[in-house]
């Protein structure tokens, strides 16, 4: 992945276009404020896993590896609290939201580990989701989050870059309940953020020119919409990184108690400015 200086005017224009496209496709958006000094906070997916059960919103905060992302978490906890989320303290091991893929119907999830998240995070994720979590080992340092190496469509079709996973992880994926079929995507398209997708109904937003991925999507009855997000590629993310979906709880989800909110609620401080979008479906 190429990392370089971002043209902030172009980035803001691309972000506004992305927000408009999501709304036009039927997504409901919540705006999260920019965290001053934490420039990667635009990648809202990494901060927390969001879940809704019987009208109650819950947020499991992430445990980012790098200090640059760690400094976002208290500000994000305050905002999510104001939005009505019960705040769950983060796992005691490394975990970032970009390494979790919720399976259709909320019946389980996939956890990418080995780069930014720990396999041991699966234990707390299973408690939070009240659903099985299947760990998959990532081996390519250039595909460091699960959402750069894999996307699971709403029908259970998994678009996968095989080069990103260990052989054992690929075998596990193919046997995972909820995965209907596995379709391979070449590494060059995954490296270009071709699997960092956002699905809203039959529309799938793609932040890069990826002929292979878009052909697969059309073959599955989806309508790929390509949007310019190259300025975010320079910072290491694309469409899926920019949003955090509020997932419906699976049929087995129970009424778990949130950890004491005071553990993650420091003294309030003002947040200002407009930043990334989260979307609810």
Put a short name on every predicted segment.
Residues 1-265, 278-281:
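The feature marks the mature, well-folded catalytic cores of soluble enzymes
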Residues 268:
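Cationic, low-complexity basic patches in intrinsically disordered or flexible, solvent-exposed regions
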């Amino acid at each position: 992945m190429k990392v370089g200086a971002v043209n902030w005017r172009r980035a803001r224009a691309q972000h506004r276009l992305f927000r408009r496209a999501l709304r036009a496709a039927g997504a409901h958006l919540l705006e999260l404020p920019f965290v001053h000094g934490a420039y990667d906070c635009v990648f809202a997916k990494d901060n927390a896993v969001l879940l809704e059960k019987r009208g109650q919103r819950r947020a499991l905060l992430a445990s980012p590896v790098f200090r640059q992302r760690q400094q976002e978490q208290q500000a994000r906890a305050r905002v999510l609290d104001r939005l009505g989320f019960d705040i769950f303290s983060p796992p005691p091991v490394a975990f970032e939201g970009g390494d979790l893929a919720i399976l259709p119907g909320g019946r389980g999830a996939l956890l990418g580990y080995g780069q930014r998240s720990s396999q041991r995070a699966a234990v707390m994720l299973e408690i939070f989701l009240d659903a099985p979590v299947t760990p998959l080992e990532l081996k390519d340092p250039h595909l460091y989050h699960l959402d750069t190496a894999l996307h699971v469509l709403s029908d259970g079709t998994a678009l996968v870059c095989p080069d990103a996973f260990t052989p054992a992880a690929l075998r596990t994926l193919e046997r995972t309940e909820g995965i209907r079929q596995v379709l391979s995507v070449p590494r060059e398209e995954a490296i270009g953020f071709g699997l960092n997708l956002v699905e809203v109904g039959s529309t799938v937003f793609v932040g890069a020119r990826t002929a292979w991925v878009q052909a697969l999507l059309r073959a599955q009855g989806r309508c790929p919409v390509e949007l310019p997000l190259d300025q975010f590629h320079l910072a290491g993310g694309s469409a899926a990184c920019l949003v955090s979906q509020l997932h419906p709880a699976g049929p087995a989800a129970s009424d778990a108690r949130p950890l004491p909110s005071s553990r993650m609620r420091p003294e309030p401080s003002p947040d200002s400015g407009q930043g990334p979008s989260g979307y609810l479906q």
